[in-house]
């Protein structure tokens, strides 16, 4: 089985080959002796031997004391067969021992071989079975990038829409492969599960924000009020909130920074939400979990993910389904493993499959809600499922504005903006409401685009002051995208400074209770540290230095002193306001560039792949690049004929057109996992957004922003909402590497635009295909409510909320140092 460069360490001198010598041995209790006359003498004279038989079995044999040797010689020695230790990912302590000892042994429980074995076992049984697969869009994008490179489009058909293999086509072909070869019943992408996870993420964020506002009100209450509660007596977690969809980040936080666990979102990842749909919703709709069912069905759920750490996430004991008696996700395959599986079965994903066009047209056809909910599902191909289900058609490849790592930050930013709009809509001028309104958005790239801050500001000059607790500040939301382990270190320091918590290493677990709240004396210390941090005025000197420098640059030549003072005060006030605000939310991912560059993704082509592509590609009279593509395609954006290829092959090259600043050079050196590069990640990113309707829509933000800013100066500092994107295939120029991606910014601004037409469209008839996102909202609410009613049949509001939290929430626990360094292992 092949592993990515993210897990394979070849340059360590303490590397050990895979073996059964595990770091977590099986413990066995000693049997008490029946003869207590002289236990010490017997222990001193007796001995135990462990022998290996010819069949590889282990046997324990006991040698009697020397006083009874004559009697022992007359009878055969007693032997006891020892049980073989079974080690799986359930036994993972997150100690990093598998990296240098037994990587293959631990991963065997989550591999294509295990999937083959499990499906073969299901096929041999006579019980009802349901086999479901969930495929991530990042995996589809990686496959699209690979096979588009290996099978370039002819020059006559080259266009933006045909330059890559469409994700919808890939999804249908993979679905055909899994159903015909392995007998899968349903194959979905994870976008609908992600949609439910995002809705739950939004629900949790507003709960935390409400808790934060309650604590703020209690802090501002008069001190002589005897009935005043302490702010820390408000139940529930508060802000900032950190993303929890990345298992690598969760593993790192549990091992190293247990003090941050109360701030990590408890919402399940899209993979685990897909498991809830596969193990709860689908069987219930298919009638497999009905009381009249003859026996318990066998449900097997496989996911295809861009990350090896998703295997660890699926193996967590928290994700065990008590109803079905199985895990929410039984097996996780990486993108590379799925690709190898198709190659082993001689399946050509570039060849159309029977009924492809009809199936794709049917998937995008406009259907009313009644038709979409009551159409018999054609995906049921297993003979064991005999009933005609009324399974709603799940939407495919939902276009979620935001990043290619899930769009968590952008979703919350939009939700906060729409919440502000709903409160202040009637107070806005009629001309602004008709034309459209956008917030002020500050985007700041910190060193590289893998650490980007977003500050959402309300256009306060258009709204009369109100009495809510948010009117004191124009900042509605402050968040960040933090990708890569190097940026995680900076993020942790920022969060510790903002919250006042400390890294207590071994005592990390004692800071967090079962619900993720700080407890005991450690909680008191954290409160004191947080108060001191707020009193210090975090980052004052650094901010003032930068503000002063900016003021000198922006001084007016006619009156430099007055202008410099005005700009300095403005920027000082803005910096102080942002610093006091802190982060509301951070989208954290452990991989550089996010999930499209996960450790389980397909690696870039090697030199041999390039040579094969060159020799197999027919070249016409037009000029071609080194990859065999006609110039003007993907390679047209590169600095020279060979630069794109050299970047993709992870080799150094020189820019032939323009000098690159030092900051851009530093950005170019930032690579993903071993064997990949920024250029290849960019191609996967382009494949991910190729069908994005938001990215293909041009919005002239500058005109709208001027309407918002009339009557007042733009006080948003480094606000950049005047960028206009040119589609999903707009490249990130190497000469401007520290700027925000234009297409990312375009998608964000498009999702934030609100007008009367936008509000009127919300009352129209919802149809699948016509507006997949609106249909997904309705279906997501239906799925969540139905699952909650199944878990809490009484229908009580508190019981339904508790059932919802149990279905879509989880908890995290700090790992103490003793478990990490092996001292907790009992030999």
From Swiss-Prot:
List of residues binding [4Fe-4S] cluster 2: 246, 307, 591, 595
For this record, an example GO cellular component is: cytosolic [4Fe-4S] assembly targeting complex
Indicate the segments annotated as coiled coil, or none if absent. Answer: none
Q: Which GO terms describe its biological process?
A: iron-sulfur cluster assembly
Q: Which InterPro entries match?
A: Cytosolic_Fe-S_CAF (IPR050340), Fe_hydrogenase (IPR009016), Fe_hydrogenase_lsu_C (IPR004108)
> Could you confirm whether the keyword Metal-binding appears in this record?
yes
Spans annotated as Disordered = 57-77, 209-231, 599-637, 709-739
Position of the signal peptide: none
Q: Which PANTHER family match?
A: NITRATE, FORMATE, IRON DEHYDROGENASE
The Swiss-Prot or TrEMBL record describes its family as follows: Belongs to the NARF family.
The name of this protein is Cytosolic Fe-S cluster assembly factor NAR1
Q: Which organism is it from?
A: Mycosarcoma maydis (Corn smut fungus)
The gene that this protein is the product of is: NAR1
């Amino acid at each position: 089985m092949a592993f990515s460069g993210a897990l394979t360490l070849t340059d360590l001198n303490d590397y050990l080959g895979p073996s059964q010598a595990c770091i977590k041995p099986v413990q066995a209790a000693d049997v008490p002796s029946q003869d207590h006359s002289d236990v010490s003498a017997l222990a001193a004279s007796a001995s135990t031997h462990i022998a290996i038989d010819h069949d590889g079995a282990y046997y324990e044999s006991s040698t009697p004391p020397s006083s009874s040797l004559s009697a022992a010689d007359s009878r055969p020695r007693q032997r006891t067969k020892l049980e073989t230790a079974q080690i799986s990912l359930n036994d993972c302590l997150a100690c990093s021992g598998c990296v240098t000892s037994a990587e293959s042994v631990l991963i065997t429980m989550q591999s294509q071989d295990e999937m083959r074995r499990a499906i073969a076992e299901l096929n041999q049984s006579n019980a009802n079975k349901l086999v479901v697969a969930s495929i991530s869009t990042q995996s589809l994008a990686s496959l699209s990038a690979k096979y588009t490179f290996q099978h370039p489009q002819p020059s006559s058909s080259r266009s933006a829409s045909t330059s890559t293999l469409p994700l919808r086509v890939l999804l249908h072909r993979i679905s055909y492969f899994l159903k015909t070869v392995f007998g899968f019943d349903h194959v979905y992408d994870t976008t609908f599960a992600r949609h439910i996870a995002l809705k739950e993420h939004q629900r949790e964020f507003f709960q935390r924000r409400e808790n934060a506002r309650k604590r703020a009100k209690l802090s501002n209450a008069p001190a002589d009020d005897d009935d005043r509660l302490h702010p820390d007596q408000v139940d529930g977690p508060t802000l900032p909130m950190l993303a929890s969809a990345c298992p690598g980040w969760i593993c790192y936080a549990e091992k190293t920074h247990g003090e941050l666990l109360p701030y990590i979102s408890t919402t399940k990842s899209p993979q685990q939400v897909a498991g809830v749909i596969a193990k709860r919703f689908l069987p219930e709709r298919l009638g497999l979990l009905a009381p009249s069912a003859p026996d318990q069905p066998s449900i097997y759920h496989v996911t295809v993910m861009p990350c090896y750490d998703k295997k660890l996430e699926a193996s967590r004991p928290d994700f065990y389904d008590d109803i079905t008696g199985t895990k929410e996700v039984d097996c996780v395959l990486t993108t590379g493993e799925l690709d190898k599986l198709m190659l082993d079965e001689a399946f050509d994903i570039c060849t159309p499959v029977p009924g492809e066009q009809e199936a794709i047209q049917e998937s995008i056809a406009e259907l009313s809600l009644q038709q979409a909910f009551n159409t018999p599902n054609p995906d049921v191909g297993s003979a064991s499922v005999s009933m005609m289900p009324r399974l709603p058609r799940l939407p495919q490849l939902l276009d979620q504005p935001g990043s290619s790592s899930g769009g968590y930050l952008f979703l919350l930013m939009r939700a906060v903006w729409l919440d502000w709009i709903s409160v202040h809509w009637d107070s806005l001028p009629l001309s602004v409401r008709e034309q459209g309104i956008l917030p002020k958005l500050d985007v700041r790239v910190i060193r590289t685009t893998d650490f980007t801050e977003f500050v959402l500001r309300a256009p306060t000059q258009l709204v009369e002051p109100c009495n809510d607790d948010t009117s004191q500040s124009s900042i509605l939301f402050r968040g960040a995208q933090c990708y890569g382990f190097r940026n995680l270190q900076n993020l942790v320091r920022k969060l510790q400074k903002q919250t006042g918590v400390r890294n207590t290493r071994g005592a990390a677990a004692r800071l967090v209770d079962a619900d993720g709240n700080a407890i005991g004396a450690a909680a008191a210390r954290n409160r004191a540290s947080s108060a001191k941090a707020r009193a210090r005025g975090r980052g004052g000197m650094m901010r003032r230095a930068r503000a002063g420098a900016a003021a000198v640059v922006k001084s007016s030549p006619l009156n430099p002193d007055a202008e410099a003072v005005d700009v300095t005060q403005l920027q000082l006030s803005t910096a102080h306001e942002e610093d006091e605000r802190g982060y509301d939310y951070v989208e954290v991912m452990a991989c550089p560039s996010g999930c499209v560059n996960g450790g389980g993704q397909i690696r870039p082509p090697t030199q041999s792949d390039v040579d094969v592509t060159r020799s197999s590609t027919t070249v016409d009279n037009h000029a071609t690049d080194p990859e065999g593509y006609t110039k003007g395609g993907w390679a047209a954006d590169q600095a020279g004929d060979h630069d794109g290829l050299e970047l993709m092959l992870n080799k150094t090259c020189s820019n032939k057109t323009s000098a690159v600043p030092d900051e851009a050079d530093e950005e170019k050196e930032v690579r993903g996992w071993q064997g990949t590069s920024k250029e290849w990640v960019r191609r996967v990113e382009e494949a991910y957004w190729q069908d994005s309707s938001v990215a293909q829509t041009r919005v002239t933000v500058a005109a709208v922003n001027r309407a918002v800013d009339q009557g007042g100066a733009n006080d948003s500092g480094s606000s950049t909402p005047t960028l206009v994107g040119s589609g999903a295939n707009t490249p990130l120029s190497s000469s401007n590497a520290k700027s925000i991606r234009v297409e990312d910014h375009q998608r964000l601004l498009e999702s934030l635009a609100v007008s009367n037409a936008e509000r009127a469209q919300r009352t129209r008839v919802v149809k699948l295909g016509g507006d997949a996102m609106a249909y997904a909202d309705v279906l997501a609410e239906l799925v969540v409510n139905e699952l909650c009613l199944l878990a809490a049949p009484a229908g009580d509001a508190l019981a339904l909320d508790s059932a919802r939290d149990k279905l879509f929430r989880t908890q995290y626990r700090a790992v103490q140092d003793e478990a990490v360094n092996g001292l907790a292992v009992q030999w």
